[in-house]
Amino acid sequence: MHWADVIAADLLKRSNSHRIATGISPSGHIHLGNLREMVTADAIRRALLDAGGEAKIVYIADDFDPLRRRYPFLPEEYENYVGMPLCKIPDPEGCHDSYSEHFLQPFLESLEILGIPVEVRRAYQMYSEGLYENNTRIALKRRDEIARIIAEVTGRELEERWYPFMPLCENCGRINSTRVTSFDENWIYYECDCGHSGRVGYVGGGKLTWRVDWAARWQILSITCEPFGKDHAAAGGSYDTGVRIAREIFDYEPPYPVPYEWIHLKGKGAMKSSKGIVLPVREMVEVIPPEIVRYITIRVKPERHIEFDPGLGLLDLVEEFEEKFKEKDRSVELSLVGEVVYSDVPFRHLIVVGQIANWDLEKALEIIERTGYTVDDVTRRDVERRLKYARKWLEKYAPDNIKFEIPEKVTAEFSEEEKKFLRAYAERLRSDMKPEEIHTLVYDVSKEVGIKSSKAFQAIYKAILGKTYGPRVGYFIKSLGVEWVRERIKAAL
């Protein structure tokens, strides 16, 4: 049973209708690591619907969070905006209304491409519309109880003057440098490190501290399930305090937790916008088919960490998906977006074919047919769609040894044993051979003429590409055309 179906079954024991929360701060490029939360939520949503339940995903954009520091990708003047809410900071490139929208909009567009429908809630708007007003009043009045809960759960004593609220300074515009001094029914009074003292209202005048805000939004948005990163799930972490604050302060049953592990970028570690270790989601959905982007997360349980390699590792992942597609695997089913067709043509083959055909669809289909595949309507639709991704992947993530161009003339020099092998190999090549037979022939002929098979393969690549490496020989020669290759070898010698 797939992990999403297991969670859905548990949720349906509680209720038939569910609201699944997701929340990401738009403080930088929203990346593949962040996307795990969204895809996990959507897999659960789909599993609930398949089981006869009702489900909706609520995405909370934490745009009321402060800019914590000037990240490496920001210009120096953004030092002046540290501590201000993301929604109040200008877009670094001047193309959106605010800093937060600059990173949020491409992400929301990506969610649409990935088939993830969400109810979008912006934190600042929620506070400004008064949705948090009642919870803010309760939290301030019961701050001693909240402080006790936090101390009991985390072992961390809060100072006596602590309040669960961060006022927005009317003077400097910062939200992380203020302290509440007192409150009454109408106002919350504060002082700020900038030297200003003032008061703000309960609607839009600031925000609850994180652990209290999280518990409050569960109640405000009627959340019943939420995936979140393993840091929040640690003993004494945000979820543990949130559970008690929700129950004891806001009288709300906390949502079903789905903690997940990080996605690591191979050779670089966990993805973090602040450190520049990212694969922006908007970039990913342009280079990789949406079903593969989803499959990265859906194929493994949330508690398992993912090591992602956008280079050759991705080709292995796509190959796995292609095999599972034929088996009607549940992970594949939960990954598909819309009506997607897959032919028998592997993605790896499209990468080779595309380069030979110079990415021309009709030429590519001719080559595909020549290499033994049936070209019907399904193949045409599949190749037309995935050939575009193959080209973008090659340009963006492929290692150099996958890329090739066929020069008009070959200027490589050959040893006598290489020449002997190439002549014998060209003589034995036949147009009716299958790719596997063409590949095996290299071993047969190299043995007969007394040359190492590795040297034999290098000789073929030198004759065709002018370098000592290239795609798998059998499919490569069949794609180019046996007669063309025979003439090429003769010309090279």
From Swiss-Prot:
One of its GO terms (molecular function) is ATP binding. The keyword Cytoplasm applies. The keyword RNA-binding does not apply. Its EC number is 6.1.1.6. Keywords: Aminoacyl-tRNA synthetase, ATP-binding, Cytoplasm, Ligase, Nucleotide-binding, Protein biosynthesis. A motif ('KMSKS' region) lies at residues 270-274. GO terms for cellular component: cytoplasm. A motif ('HIGH' region) lies at residues 26-34. It is an enzyme of class 6 (ligase). InterPro entries: aa-tRNA-synth_I_cd-bd, aa-tRNA-synth_I_codon-bd_sub2, aa-tRNA-synth_I_CS, aa_tRNA-synth_I_cd-bd_sf, Lys-tRNA-ligase, Lys-tRNA-ligase_SC_fold, Rossmann-like_a/b/a_fold. It comes from the Archaea. NCBIfam families: lysS_arch. HAMAP family: Lys_tRNA_synth_class1. Belongs to the class-I aminoacyl-tRNA synthetase family. This is Lysine--tRNA ligase.
